[in-house]
Amino acid sequence: MRKNNTAIIFGGLFFSCSVMAANGTLAPTVVPMVNGGQASIAISNTSPNLFTVPGDRIIAVNSLDGALTNNEQTASGGVVVATVNKKPFTFILETERGLNLSIQAVPREGAGRTIQLVSDLRGTGEEAGAWETSTPYESLLVTISQAVRGGKLPAGWYQVPVTKETLQAPAGLSSVADSVWTGNHLKMVRFVVENKTLSALNIRESDFWQPGTRAVMFSQPASQLLAGARMDVYVIRDGEGN
């Protein structure tokens, strides 16, 4: 993965956009980031906050001005942080895969936050990289497809939240990213494709090919998609594709 140490991504204050879960608690807020980038995130200064990096583990927390009153790693690879500050401050998260994520914390009173920092993990992870580079290419694509669709991820692969993944669908079809799995050089995305017309449409795997695509697979053999029908389309992409 290409590192961008100068890029700064200000995700706004990821506070008001949080949705309320069924039990009345705040649902996790997903914040897309790049390695070396920065995001401005509202956190609670009256309750602990949980930060996680899906598919990775946070191994260090560095607060340059000592604004964090507590930070404690969790067994699952996240970190719980607390502060009583009322003014914005910055802290850095380091991960097992080598990511450095800068958080500009904006303290507010209220319930503790759960923040998922989603970064493109391609190019990181020695276990996945060793397996991908040692496996013949065609066999690699087949194995990834079978493993992910069978619910057993290859070594070093992880499921991560959907962020900006898109699929260019033919006329009459819509597509929505449903799930994402990532390794070292490759990632796999499942899209839900729907026929929005009033008649059946012919479809082929090649209809969904775009730059960075390495393989396209339908969830079941099909040459047509009926009016109003949906199907899953699995796409394997390299570092150049979203």
From Swiss-Prot:
The keyword Thylakoid does not apply. Keywords: Cell membrane, Conjugation, Lipoprotein, Membrane, Palmitate, Plasmid, Signal. Disulfide bonds: none annotated. Residues 1-16 form the signal peptide. It is found in: Cell membrane. Transmembrane segments: none annotated. GO terms for cellular component: plasma membrane. Coiled coil: none annotated. A lipid is attached at residue 17 (S-diacylglycerol cysteine). NCBIfam families: PRK13736.1, TraK_Ftype. This is TraK lipoprotein. It comes from Escherichia coli.
